[in-house]
Design a protein with these regions (language model features):
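A generic structural signal for short, non-catalytic loop/turn and secondary-structure boundary residues
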Residues: 16, 32, 201-204
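Cleaved targeting-peptide boundary
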Residues: 23-30
Length: 325
């Protein structure tokens, strides 16, 4: 099965996915429980099909009929969409930065680097635009959710007619999941009492493992699985349990589970770690690893000169670009 990894920054780059539209195809015996179909996707949600069986006064004279189960087109890719907080355009080595991101580098070498994507200077608006493919005002997020005003475009509510990528792919047969930060829940709905229609599970993501709001303590986060609060860090020694690692482990478990049960079912994951947003709680292993690289010893000015030169050499910025004073 093909795979696609899309990587985004809340302040840098955003990418979107487009799959080719195919005519409806039914596999198996139409009306049988095992029948499947692809859909054109011109209408969302897809209308329910009419009953194709026969109903008579007696059961023996009647014919049962099951609607074909919707599945994606053959060879539909797995998609991993990563969005990080407060990490600029020139942070990862993939875009000329000094932070080594070798896996992203390998992926980019076989794919595309986007450098002209709309991004706001705020968290919630960028995320709303990313998951809906619309201007952030159209998705209700002119500001972050905590500053919503109750006016159109600023009420922090993603309307039902603004389908998320998760909803669209779920309706087309994907398994969908959201890991990490969700800063697109209205403040009045951000508790254990809900309502949950604006949480990931209400927006087309079947599985959610993460936190609601702009930031989280990475050692003891306000953590949820779907809409139930969980406390996996309880009983751990200080500095032992960390959300960054736990979130990655849970995402791997999720992908493994789906592929073991239904290997041909593609997966869409929105992966949104919050660790690069304050409060910063890296593990000792990461602190030691990055410190040993001495990446920032030359100071800010020399660092930005180096990144700027790297980006020109990689063709990420125009050759005639000039560095701001």
């Amino acid at each position: 099965m093909k795979h696609k990894i899309l990587i985004s920054s809340a302040l840098a780059a955003v990418t979107t996915l487009a799959l080719p539209v195919q005519a409806q195809v039914v596999t198996g015996t139409l009306g049988a429980p095992s029948a499947t179909t692809t859909i054109e996707g011109k209408q969302l949600p897809n209308p329910d099909p009419k009953f194709g069986g026969v109903i008579k006064d007696e059961a023996l004279q009647s014919t049962p009929w099951w609607a074909p189960r919707i599945v994606p087109p053959a060879a539909a890719p797995n998609v991993l969409l990563i969005i990080t907080d407060d990490s600029g355009f020139g942070v990862p080595s993939t875009f000329g930065g000094v932070i080594p991101t070798p896996t992203m580098d390998r992926i980019a070498a076989q794919g595309l680097r986007y450098n002209r994507v709309f991004s706001t200077a705020l968290c919630s608006p960028t995320r709303a635009a990313l998951i809906t493919g619309r201007n952030h005002h159209s998705a209700g997020f002119g500001v972050i959710s905590e500053q919503s005003t109750g006016f159109p475009g600023y009420n922090s509510i993603i309307a039902q007619d603004k389908a998320t990528i998760g909803r669209i792919l779920l309706d087309n047969g994907y398994a969908t999941a959201w890991f990490g930060k969700d800063h697109n829940v209205p403040a009045f709905a951000a508790s254990q009492a809900g309502p949950f229609n604006q949480w990931p599970t209400g927006l087309g993501f079947e599985y959610f493992y993460g936190f609601i709001g702009g930031d989280a303590n990475q050692w003891q986060p306000n953590l949820f699985r779907n809409t139930t609060q969980i406390y996996p860090f309880q009983g751990s020694a200080p500095g032992q349990w960390n959300l960054v690692t736990a979130m990655a482990d849970d995402a791997i478990d999720y992908m493994t589970r789906i592929h073991q049960i239904q290997p041909d079912k593609p997966i869409f994951i929105k992966y949104a770690p919050g660790a690069t947003h304050a409060p910063h709680h890296p593990t000792k292993a990461w602190v030691d690893k990055i410190s040993a690289m001495h990446l920032f010893d030359d100071g800010y000015n020399k660092l930005r000169d180096k990144i700027f030169a790297n980006q020109k050499a990689m063709g990420i910025i125009p050759q005639n670009a000039t560095l701001a004073p």
